[in-house]
Amino acid sequence: APGQRVARGDVLGLSGASGVADGPHLHLEVRVGQNNYASTRNPLLWLEPLPQTGVVAGRIVAPDGQLLFEAPISLVRVDAAAPYTATTSYAQGEPNSDSTLGENFVMDDVVPGFYQAIVETGGRRFTADLWVYPGRVNWVELVVGQ
């Protein structure tokens, strides 16, 4: 029900056989403040990562601070081997950024370590270094175009 609080272990839904889908999947939304689509947030910021992993959130921006939409970003671990991790920044208008973070991308279940965040665009490579710690949201910002 709208406004209902949930705790770890609460059943939120059950799998059924109604509707049309090509395979099992879950639609999960987090809504903050109001029960409408304009209040959605990225659920990866609200879900605990897998044990011994962290979450990376950040911003990919132009030199004037404007968010860049659908920019590809990857994480390369510098201090040891790690699984390939990549995503794109949000499309314009969705999902909505967290009102405190103002992020435009999130990656979950990232193995802890020292990483280089990489955005390649227009034949140029932009990087930022970050440490990823387990059990928390780790932050990085890349300015593209300087």
Regions found by a protein language model. Name each.
Residues 62-90:
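Short, ordered, surface-exposed loop/turn motifs in non-cytosolic proteins
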